[in-house]
Amino acid sequence: MNGKEGPGGFRKRKHDNFPHNQRREGKDASSSSPVMLAFKSFQQELDTRHDKYERLVKLSRDITVESKRTIFLLHRITSAPDMEEILTESESKLDGVRQKMLQVAQELSGEDMHQFHRAVTTGLQEYVEAVSFQHFIRTRSLISMEEINRQLTFTTDDSGKESKAPPADGQDKQLVTWRLKITPVDYLLGVADLTGELMRMCINSVGNGDIDTPFEVSQFLRQVYDGFSFIGNTGPYEVSKKLYTLKQSLSKVENACYALKVRGSEIPKHMLADVFSVKTEMIDQEESIS
């Protein structure tokens, strides 16, 4: 029998020559080595970052859902008898969305926004769309990015809840300020999506006998389109991609205004929406063929 072979002819491994307790001490020494400790810290840091990313994705999803519900609510304003009631309800819904925004700001505190931007960009764009839609209904103008960011500045007390009133005399409360800034790209993409909602609002308002809104929307969309045209293909890819959709919305609103001017007296008001919807479908078919 060869000296390197054990009983039964099996070849002995090299570490079999070392006692079992020495092998265990070697493992303990390797696990406490500086290299292993460094990799353990890297693992903890990555796990923490991944968990934060998933929490932000969930918050962004909630913000998107609630913002869409606010937009659906605002579309009822064309047929509702009391506009202020719907605007008040929409403001209440947006306050709930801003509470989610506060959680996003708290998650991003001390972090690089650009590392987590992809997790929250969808929710931020949808929020911009909802806020700008409400602002247009109120003022017939476009809300600025500075105004949106001003609304996303929060002050919380020790418990982490938002505190809108200053602390009373004798109360020693530590207030913390949180800020969440909308990026220019998110603002532009949200405004571009707003044009589609304004186009739907235009068609719905005509169906309810409102002849003034289509012309106000048309003038507003022309100004927005001119602004986006200055950016053109020099801006981010996502923004230039939205330019075609914006042009489609503008052309549909302009066609509605043209029909109102030329044939408005011929067609009964309750049939105008049907005429516009048919024309819109024809335009979509022509664009898909071309």
Swiss-Prot record:
The UniProt entry, under Gene3D superfamilies, shows: Translin, domain 1, Translin, domain 2
Tissues in which the UniProt entry reports expression: Detected in cerebellum.
Which residue ranges have biased composition labelled Basic and acidic residues? 16-28
Give the record's PTM text: Sumoylated with SUMO1.
Q: What are the alphabetically sorted keywords of the record?
A: Cytoplasm, Developmental protein, Differentiation, DNA-binding, Golgi apparatus, Isopeptide bond, Magnesium, Metal-binding, Nucleus, Spermatogenesis, Ubl conjugation
Instruction: Give the superkingdom in one word.
Output: Eukaryota
Principal subcellular localisation of the protein: cytoplasm
**Ranges where the record places region Interaction with C1D:** 73-208
Q: Identify the SUPFAM superfamilies for this entry.
A: Translin (SSF74784)
- In which residues is Mg(2+) bound? 129, 197
Region of interest called Disordered, as start-end residue ranges on this chain:
1-34
Q: Where is this cross-link: Glycyl lysine isopeptide (Lys-Gly) (interchain with G-Cter in SUMO2)?
A: 279
One GO BP: spermatogenesis
What is the role of this chain?
Acts in combination with TSN as an endonuclease involved in the activation of the RNA-induced silencing complex (RISC). Possible role in spermatogenesis.
PANTHER family, sorted: TRANSLIN AND TRANSLIN ASSOCIATED PROTEIN X (PTHR10741)
Protein name as it appears in the record: Translin-associated protein X
Source organism per entry reads Rattus norvegicus
Q: What's the gene?
A: Tsnax
